[in-house]
Design a protein with these regions (language model features):
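Extracytoplasmic
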Residues: 13-16, 28-30, 49-51, 88, ...
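Structural recognition of the beta-strand scaffold that forms the well-ordered cores
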Residues: 20, 45, 54-55, 83-85, ...
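Solvent-exposed coil/turn segments that connect beta secondary-structure elements
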Residues: 26, 38-40, 88, 98, ...
C-alpha cells in the first residue's frame, strides 16, 4: 500500500486521492479512509465481501445499485449523507463535482468488479 497522491489501493480507479485515517484496509480489522473524488470520477458496478459504510464529508457523491451503471437510477448524497452497502451488493458510484467521502468497514477491503474489463488491475500496462 502506498500513498503517492493517487490511490493506496490498486483496485480503485485512478484519479481519486486516498488517505488512511485508521487501521489498514489491506489487513484484517477495522479501517477508515477518506477518498477525494474529482469531478467526473466514476466507479463501475462492483461488490465487496464485507459491508461498506460511506459518509459524504463535502460535495455531492452519487451511488446506485445493480449490475449496470445507470445515473438515472442512482441517489445523490450531500455533505453529511450516509449509506451502507451490504456485503456482496452490486453497486456503483460517481461524482459530478469534487467530493470527499469517508469509507469505514472491516478489512481486508476488496473490490470485485461486475465486468472484469472495468478492473484497473486488468489494464494493459
Amino acid at each position: 500500500m502506498t500513498q503517492n497522491g493517487e490511490t493506496c489501493l490498486p483496485d480503485y480507479r485512478r484519479g481519486a486521492k486516498m488517505a488512511v485515517l485508521a487501521g489498514d484496509p489491506t489487513k484484517k480489522g477495522l479501517f477508515t479512509v477518506r477518498l477525494q473524488a474529482p469531478a467526473g470520477y466514476k466507479v463501475p458496478p462492483h461488490t465487496h465481501p464485507t459491508a461498506e459504510n460511506i459518509t459524504v464529508i463535502s460535495g455531492t457523491f452519487n451511488v446506485g445499485t445493480g449490475d449496470k451503471f445507470d445515473e438515472a437510477a442512482g441517489k445523490s448524497l450531500e455533505a453529511g449523507g450516509f449509506v451502507v452497502m451490504p456485503a456482496e451488493m452490486k453497486h456503483y458510484a460517481w461524482s459530478t463535482g469534487d467530493a470527499i467521502i469517508q469509507i469505514h468497514g472491516k478489512g481486508p477491503f476488496q473490490i470485485k468488479y461486475v465486468n472484469p474489463a472495468d478492473d484497473p488491475r486488468n489494464a494493459k500496462k
